[in-house]
Amino acid sequence: MNWSQIISLVSAGNYMEVEKILQDYPYIVDMADHLREQKLKVIANLDTYVKRTMDSVEKLGGHAYLAKDKDEARKIIGDLVGEKKTVVFSKTNVAYEIGLREFLQERNNEVWETDLGEYLVQISRGWPTHIVAPALDMTREEAAKAVKKIDPSINENSKIEDIVAAVRKFLMSKYVKADVGITGANAVAADSGSVALVENEGNIRIDTVMPPMHIAVTGIDKIVPTMRDALDEVMVQAAYAGIFPPTYINVTSGPSSTADIELRRVSPATGPKDFHLVLIDNGRLEASKNEDLKEALLCIKCGRCYFSCPIYRTLGKEWISTKSPYNGPTGVMWNYITNKDPWPASYCVHSGGCKEVCPMKINIPEVIKYIKFIGSKQVGK
Amino acid sequence: MDEDYVKKQEATIRNVLVKNLMESYVPFPLDKKIATQWAYAINVPRGGSTIIYTSYMYQMANVFKSYEKYVPTFGSLGSSKIIASIGAKLIKPKEEDIKRFNAILQNIYRIVKRSNENIGYLYEEEPYSGSLLYELGFMDEFKEYGKKVFELFKQHKVSNIITIDPHTTNTLTNLKKYIGFDIPFTPYLNLIKEAKGTGKFVLHDSCLYSRFLGMYESIRTTIRSAGVELVEDPTVTGKGAGFCCGGPVGPLNDKLSNEIAKARAETLTSVNKDVLVACPLCYANLSEFCNVKDIAEVIA
Ligand code: SF4
């Protein structure tokens, strides 16, 4: 199958699957509407919510940091991890945004992606094609070819199940000796300091409890007012990504703890003894103050808008390429927020499907039009 | 994507567009005799308070389609006079296209005349709406030119406009938003009452009509009421699943525009072999890859 065949199939599949999920679980639509309102509150007052979130994390016995840009974020995490460690990553777009994996590798750490798609991208030295399904453009044969490098028993005739099992075996050997687990966050609750993550593979569960240190790194846009909102966000994200119910929802509130003796909560227990939340600004705060741009911060990265975009469906990852892990309609907005790069917007054909399918009802074409305008001002007269 | 090429192309297009629009109200030199002959042939009244507004869209659709091809020629030329003479030679629609758009425009005129006897046309004095400026993101230039268009309509004492394509309708909607353009306008599709038509089609939605101007349902009702059968498939014609013909990216990347058109034509023809469109640019883009008809070719 070539890209155009894969994407046509996947797009039609996602469209119908999400429609069915919304019929079977009609409350998801209400949750999405409520979530939009709650996220708007945060955008209107981002500084306050960042502070509230950081205070909540510290109260739990965790540590919270705010990095203003990529360099600061890398330095904070680099210092926490140190050198010659084994680090397991769950899929995190922010880590791509700041070039974290390469940075840690350069500092003599062994770093492994544990999400299957992301792992395939890592071992084939590629770049994620889609925020939810990073290896969307890979066929079974291509995946087998990549995995053969770590397990010679895999060949081009191997079944998908065998490829998955080979990766699982390999990753298990890394989990047991991992010093640090690095995850992203689907949402962070300002009131409780909890990080919510949704997944199906089980790798995030392991990444967040097995290594003695858990670092969650995410953008300040992922902050929501309450724990309830955080759980809403993971449910809505999973539904609009087309996988519902999700196999796992993970909530982490500080380092592991127990209150089993005399009901006194102490840390650590079985899981990590250290929990760090690294919040990244990298253009988000500025965007929250820009009337034309701020709606983009509502994005919950469900990846649905990609499928309704004619440019993404034609160019795939070549559109925004390695400039950003965000692609498709949301990627045009997010590549601008994080890199100040207006050019991918020039290709927007204002097809408008993106705004129809977006759970957060972001007027994506309108935001992109603004970015186009910024680009047009930079074009020589 | 080739960022440097895009920057260069955008700069050239803007210069060519702005120069032509500010001097002559058209985006590139075009033969107005050809563009207006449809109206001369049926004696459409000149001017009037209610006008049919073509914005040259049906007449220029094929040129827009090949805009990227023309732009380097425009860009390498100096004064507007040279552009005009070379452009006039370059930009002449094919005979068969002229015949086709004349018939479409005349049919649309007859359809709208049923709801209002006194509909005029500005002939050579009709301005192009400026859609391309808006769609390429040249907002400052769009507003500046929009004011000129608004003034021109006022000079002609126009108080009611009937649009016939989605790009112009969308542009007037935005002129209203950005510069207070307050002359009422209605797309002709919303004025159709007793039209008749036949055939079985899959509708390729105009992105602007269906996803920006709230006409997704009403367009279907109009077509079906005329007796035309529409075949639907939610993954192809659903409001959020259907996608563009590729036209708008044509000026920057013709190859990409064609690839989108080809992909769109493939999904559409998987539903039904004959495709119906509501926009001249959709027609120009898709007709290379499938059998397409404009709504105004199947209802009368
Ligand atoms: S912009 Fe909307 S549809 Fe696209 S990824 Fe974000 S939330 Fe999902």
Walk through the language-model features, giving the residues of each:
Chain B
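Iron-sulfur-cluster electron-transfer modules
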Residues: M1-E126, E135-T163, T169, I179
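Phosphate- and divalent-cation-binding pockets in alpha/beta enzyme and binding domains
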Residues: N170-N174, A284-E288
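Short cysteine clusters
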Residues: S129, C207, C245, C279-C282
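Short, flexible loop segments at boundaries between secondary-structure elements
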Residues: F181-F201, P234-F243, C290-A300
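Ferredoxin-type iron-sulfur electron-transfer modules in oxidoreductases and energy-metabolism complexes
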Residues: M1-V18, K255-A263, I295-A300
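A short, acidic, amphipathic alpha-helical segment used as a generic capping/interface helix at domain edges
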Residues: F150, L256-K273
